[in-house]
Amino acid sequence: MNQDGIDVSYLKNAIATVRNATKPYEKNSTLPRSLNSLHLQHLLELSSRVVFHQIELENTVTIIRNNVAQWLWQVVLTGDKIIECLEAFRNYFLFGQGDFAISLVDQFEKLKTSRPKGLTIKDQELNSLLVRASIGTLAENDSSFEKFRFRVQNVNDKQFVTRTNMFDNITINVPLRFEYDIEWPLDLFVTTEDLAKYGDIFSFLFSLRRTQIRLQKVWTHLTITEKASSNNNNNNNNNKLNDNGSPRLILWKVLSSMMFFIDCLWGHVQMDIIETNFRKLVHRINISSAQHQQFRKLKIPEHKKISYANETNLVETEPFRDFEDIRIGHSTYLSDLLHGCLLESRVCSDAIKKSLNICDQICGLLERLNSNMVDKNISESVTKLEKEFREQVTFLFRTLSGLNKKGEGFGGPPRHLDQLLLRLDYSKYFSVWS
């Protein structure tokens, strides 16, 4: 379909969506008669031409599309409402609310220890957990938070396991989806597919943040046991912490390398990917909203407004013309997030998931240590898991390095891989491993 066909299709769908809406916008549910007359006049003039010119048709369709966009922006939605929705997604889908993220992880850890194995978990239980996690955080008084919910996914659902949703069951071994109840008119630019992508990113970020917090707690636990053991005079113990090459020293090294990797990955997805792309999207919506506000203040004919819009050049960022542009821009933003989180690469996602599982196993072993004594079996298990972790991280580093050079699977060498590799290898740490 050419651009004219796309524009005409947009006009039809946009107007039909408003007319069929269940919300009380009846008095504004149809285009003004003056606007209809203006559009009809343009079309009649075009049809009366002796010679057909494609450029005239394109100009006419552009005028009509921009006029309809102005009308939609006024009676349906404003840029502020869109940004409020995006900020809610940023806070909860993308873990922008740090206090809530920590509380949510804690609630899930409590659920794992208190829930009998084999007991079926229900949506109501998870949503009660969600409410408890919000207590004492900024989410508690956030009205947008009420629209979020958990859902236990049916194993018979289509496309149950894909490259992007493989992190759904890493938390409590039950496939969970974090969802949002989208309402009209926000569904003009947020589709069901978009919400599914947000759910995929949430599962990945939750798994990453949970592992990060757990490693930090284990580090604190080892520090406490070290201080406790330093008060004892067990200098004859071959396994004490201060012996060079001792099992306890190996534990610190393993934890340090794991925390470094997880911290690099978390910092990359939050700062280099999510925050950067979020700011760009919000900026485009802001300048688009400002432009629409400016049009409303100017008391000039509609066709003149279109000419003004075409002559307005914003050097920094191109504004969105209408909701279809916003929808496309938002979909592009989500695609950039998925690529930046490496979720579009099954190989990379699989390596990250295996690395997180290994970190979990290490934490499970070390959480049981209550003294400076390191059992031989624990020492051997940690050594084995550390080797597996090293293999996965080395494989991931080599894969990313190869993708960065060749651009395979990403449509060209993406800049975000440069940023991630720089974080990981700024001191040649992973180059030595590789």
Regions found by a protein language model. Name each.
Residues M1-S434:
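Long alpha-helical rod scaffolds of large eukaryotic non-enzymatic complex subunits
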